[in-house]
């Protein structure tokens, strides 16, 4: 037994501040390279937040058919216009794919609670057609925990305006990487998804969707679900060491490339991985 242990053992270095993870020599080398040139996302100029929590989705997340019905019930063109502006397309976690999304024709009635000192909360009496719709669910709305100043309003959300910005959106539970770019800030996301706003997201999304980061999250930084599942929690994503954008030739190439194999190859070059390390990463 002692001979077997000596033959099969690997030397690992443990930092007292980190969780203990047993890594093979090649995995230790990969981790060292990732951390030597990467900066944890918590030190980037970005913000990661979860999607909107309504407290009762049946009332606030509606189909296109229901949206049109509400708009048809508006008593004036003015009410119809401002009501249409308040009802926003929404993505659920399951709608978000790698580099894209399949919008399910769902909308959020965004009767937000305002932002203190910045934006007033929605006054429901200014939206009679929406009020009539929500009153059908009064018993549920009035007793739910996640509500604003009135049962008609959504809970406080300090980053409400971030939904209007260009952003990366992603779902929490996946089998791999599933990050998509909402270039124009068109969508709100539900509480089964997250959003990332800030600088250089066109570059960041290429790294987040890469095999390198999927490997690193799975083996070093993330939370596993069963044999293949990943849970992309914000507190773990912020640990990911990714090279900050400095306008290098390789980084600009990564941004400009659209072919997946070319993107992956450039990212391998960015981290200076050997052929053996690349082969090991590709086993995921």
Predicted segment positions?
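Polybasic, glycine- and aromatic-enriched phosphate-binding surface used to engage nucleic acids
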Residues: 3-6, 10-249
């Amino acid at each position: 037994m002692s001979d077997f242990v000596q033959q099969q053992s690997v030397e690992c270095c443990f930092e007292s501040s980190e969780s203990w993870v047993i890594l093979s020599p090649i995995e230790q080398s990969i981790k060292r390279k990732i951390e030597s040139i990467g900066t944890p996302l918590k030190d980037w100029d970005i913000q990661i937040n979860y999607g909107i929590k309504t407290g009762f989705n049946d009332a606030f997340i509606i189909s296109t058919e229901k949206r049109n019905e509400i708009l048809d019930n508006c008593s004036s063109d003015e009410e119809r216009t401002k009501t249409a502006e308040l009802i926003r397309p929404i993505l659920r976690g399951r709608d978000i794919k790698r580099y894209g999304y399949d919008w399910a024709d769902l909308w959020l009635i965004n009767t937000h609670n305002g932002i203190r000192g910045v934006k007033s909360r929605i006054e429901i009496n200014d939206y009679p057609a929406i009020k009539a719709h929500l009153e059908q669910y009064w018993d549920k709305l009035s007793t739910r925990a996640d509500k604003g100043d009135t049962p008609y309003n959504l809970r406080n959300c300090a980053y409400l305006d971030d939904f209007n910005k260009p952003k990366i959106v992603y779902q929490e539970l996946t089998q791999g990487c599933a990050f998509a770019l909402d270039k124009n800030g068109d969508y709100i996301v539900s509480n089964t998804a997250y959003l990332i706003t800030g600088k250089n997201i066109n570059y960041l999304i290429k790294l987040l969707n890469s095999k390198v980061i999927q490997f690193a999250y799975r083996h070093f930084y993330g939370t596993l679900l069963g044999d293949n599942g990943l849970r992309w929690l914000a507190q773990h994503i912020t640990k990911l060491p990714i090279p900050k954008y400095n306008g290098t030739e390789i980084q600009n190439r990564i941004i400009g490339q659209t072919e997946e194999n070319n993107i992956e190859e450039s990212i391998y070059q960015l981290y200076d991985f050997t052929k053996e390390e690349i082969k090991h990463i590709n086993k995921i």
